């Protein structure tokens, strides 16, 4: 594979990002077809704390977003990772891992206390994520809702993402 460039998104990237997200989730049995719309709504609301793209040969082929979450309706410096998207022809080549690692590093530089996500435990455990019974995302199987604390204790309570998630 050619050189990979990970960078912050630019305003001019939004159409390409939407295309990448749509392609990435097109055949995903857990996707609902709204992933690109969710990112766009968060962008319009200035709610994307971190939004990174992965480029190969100056073409955007991956994207990741991080946004604030609340625990028991209070923002306590925890963030949600959602979504991470890689164009299908570039999947399974380490781009998702690179985006996740870079995003988590940037969150820590922002003095975040932790990050949550909804995803496959077998994939995300390599980054340190694990289910934690103290954090609850209603109507979701507990083993798929995972947390990563950046050093402190994990809070307890009901987690809410940005309203764009529905």
Stretches with model-predicted labels:
Residues 68-70:
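A short acidic/small-residue loop/turn micro-motif
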Residues 75-88:
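Conserved acetyl-CoA binding element of GNAT-fold acetyltransferases
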Residues 18, 25-56, 61-65:
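Active-site rim helix/loop that mediates acceptor-substrate recognition in acyltransferases
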Residues 86, 92-105, 117:
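Conserved acetyl-CoA-binding loop-helix of GNAT-fold acetyltransferases
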Residues 4-17:
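A short beta-loop-alpha structural element at the N-terminal edge
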Residues 116, 137-166:
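C-terminal "cap" of GNAT-fold acetyltransferases
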Residues 109-113, 118-142:
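Conserved active-site alpha-helix within GNAT-family acetyltransferase domains
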Residues 49, 76, 112:
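Short coil/loop residues immediately preceding or within conserved phosphate-binding loops
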């Amino acid at each position: 594979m050619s050189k990979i460039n990970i960078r912050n998104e630019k305003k001019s990237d939004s159409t390409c990002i939407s295309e990448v997200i749509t392609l990435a989730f097109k055949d995903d049995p857990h996707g609902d077809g709204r992933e690109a719309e969710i990112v766009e709504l968060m962008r319009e609301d200035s709610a994307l704390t971190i939004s990174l793209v992965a480029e190969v040969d100056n073409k955007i082929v991956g994207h990741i977003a991080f946004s604030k979450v609340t625990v028991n309706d209070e923002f306590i410096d925890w963030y949600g990772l959602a979504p991470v998207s890689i164009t299908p022809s570039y999947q399974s080549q380490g781009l998702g891992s690179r985006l996740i690692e870079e995003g988590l590093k940037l969150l820590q530089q922002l003095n975040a206390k932790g990050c949550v996500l909804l995803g496959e435990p077998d994939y995300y455990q390599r980054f340190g994520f694990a289910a934690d019974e103290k954090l609850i995302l209603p109507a979701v199987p507990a083993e798929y809702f995972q947390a990563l604390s950046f050093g402190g204790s994990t809070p307890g309570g009901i987690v809410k993402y940005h309203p764009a998630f529905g």
